[in-house]
A protein has these predicted regions:
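A mature extracytoplasmic/lumenal domain signature
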Residues: 58-62, 82-84, 100-102
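Sequence contexts marking disulfide-bonded cysteines in secreted/extracellular proteins
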Residues: 20-22, 62-64
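Sec-dependent N-terminal signal peptides
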Residues: 3-14
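Structural detector for short beta-strands of small beta-barrel domains
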Residues: 25-59
Length: 123
C-alpha cells in the first residue's frame, strides 16, 4: 500500500513539473499567439459606464501557475500603455504574439477574466 501511494505521488509530482505553465518568474520567456480585441463592457458587473476593455484571445489553452493552482486559460484581459493605445489599429483583430512582462490573478470587479496582463509587448 505504501508503495502504491508513493508511485501515485511521484506520478502526480512529475506531471506538475512537465506541465509548461507560465509563472511570475518566467512569463517573458513564453510568448503567446492569439488575437487582441476591443470589447466594450460595463465598468462594474452589469452596471456603470461602458468602457473599452482589451482582451487577448489565445490560440490554445495556456497554463498559468498561480497561488491558487495551475489554470488553463483561453483569454486574458490586457492593460495597454499609452503608446500601444495610439497604435491600437495596428495590433487589434489580427494574429499577433504577446510577450507578457507582468501579470496578476484577476476576477475582481475591475478584471473580467481570471488572468490580468498588466504589461506586455505585441508583435
Amino acid at each position: 500500500m505504501k508503495l502504491l501511494f508513493l508511485l501515485f505521488f511521484l506520478s502526480i509530482s512529475s506531471y506538475a513539473h512537465t506541465k509548461d505553465c507560465i509563472n511570475y518568474e518566467d512569463s517573458e520567456s513564453n510568448p503567446i499567439s492569439g488575437e487582441l480585441k476591443v470589447i466594450p463592457t460595463h465598468m462594474f458587473y452589469g452596471h456603470g459606464d461602458i468602457i473599452d476593455n482589451y482582451f487577448f484571445f489565445l490560440d490554445k489553452n495556456t497554463c498559468f501557475s498561480t497561488e491558487y493552482g495551475d489554470w488553463d486559460i483561453k483569454q486574458v484581459q490586457v492593460i495597454l500603455s499609452e503608446e500601444q493605445l495610439k497604435k491600437i489599429d495596428q495590433i487589434t483583430y489580427k494574429k499577433i504574439t504577446m510577450e507578457i512582462e507582468d501579470w496578476m490573478v484577476g476576477e475582481t470587479q475591475s478584471w473580467k477574466t481570471r488572468i490580468g496582463i498588466l504589461k506586455a509587448k505585441f508583435r
